[in-house]
Amino acid sequence: KMLSSIADEDALVVFVVDLFDLYGSMISGLKRFVGDNPILFVANKVDLYPKSVNRNRLKAWIERHAKEYGIKPVDTLLVSGHKRIQIDELLEKINEYRKGKDAYVVGVTNVGKSTLINKLIQSIGETGEVITTSQYPGTTLGQIDIPFDEHSSLVDTPGIIHRHQITHYLAEKEMKKVLPQ
C-alpha cells in the first residue's frame, strides 16, 4: 500500500537492487506503483564484484534487465553503501533528478537501502547512523522522512518482502554465512 501511494506524488524514485541477487530484488510492476515518476536505478554492493569486471558492461546488463521489467531509468549507478563507492555521485544524481521534490528510496528487503541512506546522510555532514540497519528482513517498519530542506525529504520506505529472495528461507546462522558484507 505504501509503495502504491508514490504514484500519487510528484517525486523521484530511487530504486535500489542487490547486484548479487538482481532477479530476486526486482519488483514486478514497479511502474504501476510509482506512476510516471522518474526512476534512478541504483545497483548496490558493486564492491563485491572483482575489480576485473568491466563496469560499463555490468551497467549495460543491468539496464537490459531493467528494460525487461518495463523500467526505463533516468540513470543507473553502481554503488556500494558498505564501502562508500559512488555515494557522493549518488547524492549528486538524487539532487539533480529530484528537482527540489521528495525522493523515495524503494526496493525489496536486504538490498541495502538503509545503509545507503545512512551513507548519504554522512556525505552531507551528519554523523552517526540515523536509520537502523540489520541483516534481517523487515527492519524498516514504516516510512522514514529525512529532510533535504524545509520543502522536501529523502524518504526511506520499508523493504518489500519478495518470496523469490533466498534470505526469507534461511535461519540466522545461515544468513550470516550467505549475506555478503
Regions found by a protein language model. Name each.
Residues 113-114, 178:
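Short amphipathic alpha-helical patches
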Residues 1-13, 37-40, 46, 131-181:
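Helix-rich effector regions associated with P-loop NTPase G domains
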Residues 2-75, 87, 150-151, 179-181:
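Conserved C-terminal guanine-recognition region of P-loop GTPase G domains, centered on the G4
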Residues 18, 114-115:
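Acidic, metal-binding active-site segment of PIN/NYN-like and related structure-specific nucleases
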Residues 22, 83-86, 137-141:
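Short acidic loop-to-helix transition motifs that present clustered carboxylates
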Residues 24-25, 114, 163-165:
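Short helix/loop capping segments that flank catalytic or ligand/cofactor-binding pockets
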Residues 40, 48-111, 118-134:
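Canonical P-loop GTPase G-domain recognition
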Residues 18, 121, 158-159:
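Short glycine-/small-residue-rich Rossmann-like dinucleotide-binding loops
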